[in-house]
């Protein structure tokens, strides 16, 4: 795959064991829990050849999202304070809102699109999404793009 290869966001549960193990090896090396590739692949239970095959092609989403503008699509219940609680989480995690677009509520819900600059955020995007989804009134949240 060349530099212009397409990138995809794929949920972890559909990845093959080899790819999951490659990611785990990279995490062990990055965290210092394993000093060498040989040590890390033995801990995880993957061959070195499988690791080398995938290592340059798999990255956690957070590696690409740090310092970028990410657009989220949300479905929020039409209740006082729901959007405000979302914005409180963004501010608490040091995100900067670039744009907000909210539809007129229909049948008790409203669609909201928010673009956030993640440059100063310390939290991973995965944890950020989880924190947003725990807010009262949030029915659905997904990443549209960056």
UniProtKB/Swiss-Prot annotation:
Domain ACT: 71-146
InterPro entries per UniProt: ACT-like_dom_sf, ACT_dom, UPF0735_ACT_dom-cont
Entry-linked NCBIfam families: PRK04435.1 (NF003361)
Protein family (similarity comment): Belongs to the UPF0735 family.
Protein name as annotated: UPF0735 ACT domain-containing protein TTE2621
